Curated annotation (Swiss-Prot):
Keywords: Mitochondrion, Ribonucleoprotein, Ribosomal protein, Transit peptide. Residues 1-40 form a transit peptide. GO terms for cellular component: mitochondrial inner membrane; mitochondrial large ribosomal subunit. It is found in: Mitochondrion. Its main location: mitochondrion. Belongs to the universal ribosomal protein uL3 family. GO terms for molecular function: structural constituent of ribosome. This is Large ribosomal subunit protein uL3m. Component of the mitochondrial ribosome large subunit (39S) which comprises a 16S rRNA and about 50 distinct proteins. InterPro entries: Ribosomal_uL3, Ribosomal_uL3_bac/org-type, Ribosomal_uL3_CS, Transl_B-barrel_sf. GO terms for biological process: translation. SUPFAM superfamilies: Translation proteins. Pfam families: Ribosomal_L3 (PF00297).
Amino acid sequence: MPGWRLLAWAGARVLDRGTGGLGTALGSGNRTDICVLVRSLHGKSGTWWDEHLSEENVSFVKQLVSDENKAQLASKLCPLKDEPWPIHPWEPGSSRVGLVALKLGMMPLWTKDGKKHVVTLLQVQDCHVLKYTPKENHNGKMAALTVGGKTVSRFHKSTSILEFYQELGLPPKQKIKMFNVTDNAVIKPGTPLYAAHFRPGQYVDVTAKTIGKGFQGVMKRWGFKGQPATHGQTKTHRRPGAISTGDVARVWPGTKMPGQLGNVDRTAFGLKVWRINTKHNIIYVNGSVPGHRNCLVKIKDSVLPAYKDFCKNLPFPTYFPDEDEKELPEDLYDEEVCQPGAPSITFV
């Protein structure tokens, strides 16, 4: 049912007053009358579905939804009702699934040789596998796993999306990403993913949408020098100048010109993982990553050929806390990191 029809039907239940209500408009087939009624529901006086909710009622509804989401997430930590999918060993050329994490910010970190490194903190919040697509229905070469991260309110999701999550038994997610995986790395939908999916010392690729700067000129967008500031130059100082030649009589595609700066997907390749906090699911990666604070990023094993060998000793296809023989410590460090609390100087 289209959105305007659903809204008109719901409004008719409240505002229909006999022959002059929505029934007459529907019978006449005049869509304009229906739109007028729909617009009346969104007047300055407020909407008819939440105008009578008090602050106490709103807080009660939010608490009720939060408790339901926690119950759904806790049920996924229990053994599944049906048989789990088989786990295959790692093979050369295998490709694992990635994670969806929240960018918290940046902080310094020191290695044992005294060098300072700036790292970015990425927190994995309620990350689950949502859907499995076989390679026959994807691209014919690799299968695909759809992963969702960070639970959000269900009041702003459509009915079809809520039905999809209801079948999975999971609350709705804010960000959904798709990862190409090999057949031996597929994971059952509904499986939770943790920061321990990665290990300190390996290299990852982080993808996110860069910070939007709006419409900018060529000097800020591309680093052009601009025009002279003195010596008779008065008409322009920040324009690009000539953008083509007279013989060509056209502007070549791809010419650097003013336009939108930022707000596009960019990937930072080959970032080293220095530390992992298993209690709060925080990954410490080297350097900066695209995006602003509190944005959701996509993390996966690095595709750079120089770092392919680091995928041999990783949890495959992912980290399962129930099947791990010994419990992981709260913090996992790279062997080069100077751990907090360790002496800075050791006399031999």
